[in-house]
Amino acid sequence: MTQTVNVIGAGLAGSEAAYQLSERGIKVNLIEMRPVKQTPAHHTDKFAELVCSNSLRGNALTNGVGVLKEEMRRLNSIIIEAADKARVPAGGALAVDRHDFSGYITETLKNHENITVINEEINAIPDGYTIIATGPLTTETLAQEIVDITGKDQLYFYDAAAPIIEKESIDMDKVYLKSRYDKGEAAYLNCPMTEDEFNRFYDAVLEAEAAPVNSFEKEKYFEGCMPFEVMAERGRKTLLFGPMKPVGLEDPKTGKRPYAVVQLRQDDAAGTLYNIVGFQTHLKWGAQKEVIKLIPGLENVDIVRYGVMHRNTFINSPDVLNEKYELISQPNIQFAGQMTGVEGYVESAASGLVAGINLAHKILGKGEVVFPRETMIGSMAYYISHAKNNKNFQPMNANFGLLPSLETRIKDKKERYEAQANRALDYLENFKKTL
């Protein structure tokens, strides 16, 4: 009898898991509640919709997520394939046209002979092999089911999405095109600020009104997607070392470094929309408008989508999951995506890739798949299943700190990262022979 796998959730992780299974001849029910039931953050019924940003972050092998992407590329990831096809200019980063990206994935999966798409809300975990990839906005009913099978309380924190603006409404006389340190093509519009302009902006941010938070949800922020107003509360200089840092962004008109810089990144292939980099926010919409208009060049800007903030849900993975993203107590159930404690689009997709490949091998009798720790994929899987501080487990991005140390110590950070990246890809190539 042919085994059919239920994959719940068609985000990046669920889409990747379904693709890896189906490409290995496994029948998949891909269950997605949208458009039958929408979430507060999604805007379409497409699979793998990008919510927080259109950037999949750095592409170079000198950063952790760049290595992760290259590993996934070599393992025929549908997410990376779609990103490469839908790429838009973004300097050294891999940014995509959201619609082209999710559209490609949606069409590929819907037309796959081994995938059946089911649009309905799931309130109970099905029998048989199941991958739960319901993401940060898991419904309350299903979240309770997960609590029941893990025996752990859910933890909540908030992801925040940055506003998107129309390029035509930007005062181009006040901004300049440049990537930090001139890396890659000049892909960012930069809004320079004097010290006086920054101080006015900063004071307005502190006075701006935030949207209310549900009383039953404790606020916890992941550093990589923290609201800029929360950063501002940490001190007047915090933003200058965060999203508004001016280093490497000298104004070509003056040759001088501004006191602060707000960067705008292209959000669509046509180049008509830009998002405000690092300005994820939970401010009320009226407050957002007032604050944004204090940024030079954006005084008369048209905001096409205001920043929003939404709950994220993840489990205490080190207590309940293994390196194959399996539930230790019920190995027929796997988790994938941000719910496992990986943080970021690419990391979420990578967890789906591991879950999908592993389950396919199990069903086909090929043995289980544990990626080497020397690979970024393997180090992420190891982190979520072995994090030392599991009493206060927090989500983690791909980074070189997760990888085992090199046998020979290299002082220069760039050279050390390059050596770790090369080792990771060598290990992956050898590991691929066993798949």
From Swiss-Prot:
InterPro entries linked: FAD/NAD-bd_sf, MnmG-rel, MnmG-rel_CS, MnmG_N, TrmFO
GO CC terms, sorted:
cytosol
Cofactor(s) the protein needs: FAD
GO BP, one annotated term = tRNA wobble uridine modification
Q: Is Methyltransferase included in the keywords of this UniProt record?
A: yes
Q: What is its EC number?
A: 2.1.1.74
Instruction: Recall the GO molecular function terms of this protein's record.
Output: flavin adenine dinucleotide binding; tRNA (uracil(54)-C5)-methyltransferase activity, 5,10-methylenetetrahydrofolate-dependent
Where does it localize? Cytoplasm
SUPFAM superfamilies membership: FAD/NAD(P)-binding domain
Which Pfam family, just one, is annotated for this protein?
Answer: GIDA
The source's domain of life comes to Bacteria
Which residues does FAD bind?
G9, A10, G11, L12, A13, G14
> What does it catalyze?
uridine(54) in tRNA + (6R)-5,10-methylene-5,6,7,8-tetrahydrofolate + NADH + H(+) = 5-methyluridine(54) in tRNA + (6S)-5,6,7,8-tetrahydrofolate + NAD(+); uridine(54) in tRNA + (6R)-5,10-methylene-5,6,7,8-tetrahydrofolate + NADPH + H(+) = 5-methyluridine(54) in tRNA + (6S)-5,6,7,8-tetrahydrofolate + NADP(+)
Keyword annotations from UniProtKB, A to Z? Cytoplasm, FAD, Flavoprotein, Methyltransferase, NAD, NADP, Transferase, tRNA processing
Report if keyword Methyltransferase is assigned: yes
Stated family: Belongs to the MnmG family. TrmFO subfamily.
Give the function comment from the record.
Answer: Catalyzes the folate-dependent formation of 5-methyl-uridine at position 54 (M-5-U54) in all tRNAs.
Q: What is this protein called?
A: Methylenetetrahydrofolate--tRNA-(uracil-5-)-methyltransferase TrmFO
The gene that this protein is the product of is: trmFO
